[in-house]
């Protein structure tokens, strides 16, 4: 499967530490999960079902649709395109992270373009994102990174996406009258919803939120629209 093959390639480190440079480019081949190209006057009644994606792909494709609705769909990944961990130690010029929720076993090749830190003091994002310049894998799924952090962040959760942009979870392109009701996105290897050259998109009760037990969801923007 091409989606799993791409995931394996990226996670091996073959695309480097910023994989979007290799795959977030015009005409890069990609897999579509649910493809509704050309559909008209249709409603998808998901009733809370989860579309669990196996490999890196575009979850839902709405190309040239008209009067199309999706109700009650959740989108997530079988293996998340990000890893979460806990900061276990902070020194003057480095810090150590144990990845208790790794996408797979962490190696020196695993791509980490940045890290987001959940600051328990404010119950929100720490003010800065950090590049992840690792020094060593010091134990299974335990990595020492270069960088300076305040000591109080010991015990904080970090979310480490394995790429920035790739395909969106839902892509709406050259479509008219699209409605998303109670749609949830728990994770994606890029943006949540992207609309391009599209008229009249209605989103009711959209939830771009972490899956249960996680602090972070999509790797980049929740939504992004362009004319």
What kind of region is each of these model predictions?
Residues 93-101, 137-150:
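Generic recognition of long tandem-repeat/solenoid scaffolds
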Residues 3-43, 52-71, 78-95, 163-176, ...:
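Extracellular beta-strand-rich solenoid/capping regions of secreted or surface-exposed proteins
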Residues 6, 198-227:
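Long amphipathic alpha-helical scaffold regions
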Residues 44, 83-91, 124-138:
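Short, exposed beta-strand/loop patches in secreted or surface proteins that constitute
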Residues 1-11, 100, 150, 207:
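Generic short beta-strand segments
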Residues 74-76, 103-131, 149-169, 175:
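Extended Gly/Ser/Thr-rich low-complexity repeat segments
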């Amino acid at each position: 499967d091409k989606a799993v093959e791409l995931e394996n390639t990226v996670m091996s480190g073959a695309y480097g530490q910023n994989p979007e440079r290799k795959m977030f480019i015009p005409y890069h081949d990609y897999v579509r999960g649910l493809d509704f190209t050309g559909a008209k006057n249709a409603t998808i009644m998901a009733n809370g079902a989860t579309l669990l994606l196996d490999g890196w792909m575009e979850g839902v494709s709405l190309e040239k649709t008209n009067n199309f609705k999706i109700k009650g769909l959740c989108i997530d990944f079988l293996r998340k395109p990000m890893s979460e961990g806990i900061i276990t130690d902070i020194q003057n010029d480095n810090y150590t992270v144990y990845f208790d929720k790794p996408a797979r076993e962490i190696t020196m090749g695993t791509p980490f373009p940045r890290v987001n830190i959940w600051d328990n003091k404010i119950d929100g994002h720490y003010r800065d994102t950090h590049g992840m310049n690792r020094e060593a894998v010091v134990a299974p799924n335990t990595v020492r990174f270069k960088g300076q952090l305040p000591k109080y962040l010991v015990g904080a959760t970090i979310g480490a996406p394995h790429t920035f942009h790739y395909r969106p979870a839902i892509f709406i392109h050259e479509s008219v009258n699209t409605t998303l009701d109670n749609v949830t996105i728990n994770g994606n290897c890029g943006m949540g919803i992207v609309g391009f050259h599209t008229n009249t998109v209605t989103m009711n009760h959209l939830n771009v939120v972490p899956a249960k037990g996680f602090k972070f969801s999509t790797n980049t923007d929740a939504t992004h629209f362009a004319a």
